[in-house]
Amino acid sequence: MNYRRYYIPNSTVFIVGVTRNRIPRFSHQENVELFKEMFDATSDKYRFELSASVILPDHFHLLLKPVGCNFSEIMLSFKKRFTDNFKKRNGISANFSFWQGRFWDHVIRNEGDFKSHLDYIHYNPVKHGCVSKPEDWHNSSYLAWVERGAYSIGWGHTRIEELEKLSFE
């Protein structure tokens, strides 16, 4: 089956990546730190603006805007770099897949779409029962967006029905 991705220059893209078999590998902080390190290293090769992110035990969400490249190049480079370094750090020499084969993407269409996906990202740790308040999840851009005035502490403390129903995973 051929999978078609749509590339629209200067567009922000919502991306979901999932660990193979949903193994909660990001429950270990050293893997989260490797994720951040390898994502930063990827930005040395490919230019992009990262608007928002969250890393959960078995998946991650990003809102990013490629600059002069496409998001598939960014994700391919990141996932390969991450897997190679994970294998090296863990003494794995055999064939090994850290990630599910593909990632999911959605091109953001307008400000409302951006805000919906931003909320989804920041509410996701609550939705999955990792924490009861978004600010308690440290592997997220939520507090940076609080500082920017997009949220007030208290947002997400009560159940947000429309976000509970959404599933981009």
What is each PLM-predicted segment?
Residues 1-169:
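Short catalytic/metal-binding and nucleic-acid-binding patches
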